Amino acid sequence: MLQPKRTKFRKVHKGRNRGLANAGSDVSFGTYGLKAVTRGQLTARQIEAARRAMTRAVKRQGKIWIRVFPDKPITEKPLEVRMGKGKGNVEYWVALIQPGKVLYEMDGVPEETAREAFALAAAKLSVKTTFVIRTAM
């Protein structure tokens, strides 16, 4: 699963996920892309599950790029633990997603196959997505 090899700080503040995606909003590596329409956060497990679904759908042909990386740690306290006594332990990693962010790209497969693969991947994700095609090469 995806997670940073090392970080400057172990835990981060919750923060807010505002604004639109400026960087990473265009299909730049492949021909087809899966773009986020709503905001949210994708866990490393969701990113990997969608990647596996796409790889299986295209029968390991073509090439797939993952354009998001989970770099934010999410902490949780154990069950039945009283409030206080510090922040919980890091349980999983997420990538913050803004509307307009390209999540995955694909090349080397027919458009219909790419659409089917992205539809399978979109079912694994917690944000609404749309299929996009690269306009200028």
From Swiss-Prot:
The record's annotation in PROSITE patterns points to:
RIBOSOMAL_L16_1, RIBOSOMAL_L16_2
Biological role: Binds 23S rRNA and is also seen to make contacts with the A and possibly P site tRNAs.
> What is the protein name given in its UniProt record?
Large ribosomal subunit protein uL16
Q: Which UniProt keywords apply?
A: Ribonucleoprotein, Ribosomal protein, RNA-binding, rRNA-binding, tRNA-binding
Record GO biological process: translation
The lineage's top-level taxon is: Bacteria
**Record-linked Pfam families:** Ribosomal_L16
**Cited InterPro entries:** Ribosomal_uL16, Ribosomal_uL16_bact-type, Ribosomal_uL16_CS, Ribosomal_uL16_dom, Ribosomal_uL16_sf
Q: What is stated as this protein's family in its record?
A: Belongs to the universal ribosomal protein uL16 family.
Q: Which NCBIfam families match?
A: rplP_bact (TIGR01164)
Q: What PANTHER family would the database entry show?
A: 50S/60S RIBOSOMAL PROTEIN L16 (PTHR12220), LARGE RIBOSOMAL SUBUNIT PROTEIN UL16M (PTHR12220:SF13)
To which species is this protein native?
A: Tolumonas auensis (strain DSM 9187 / NBRC 110442 / TA 4)
The gene behind this protein is rplP
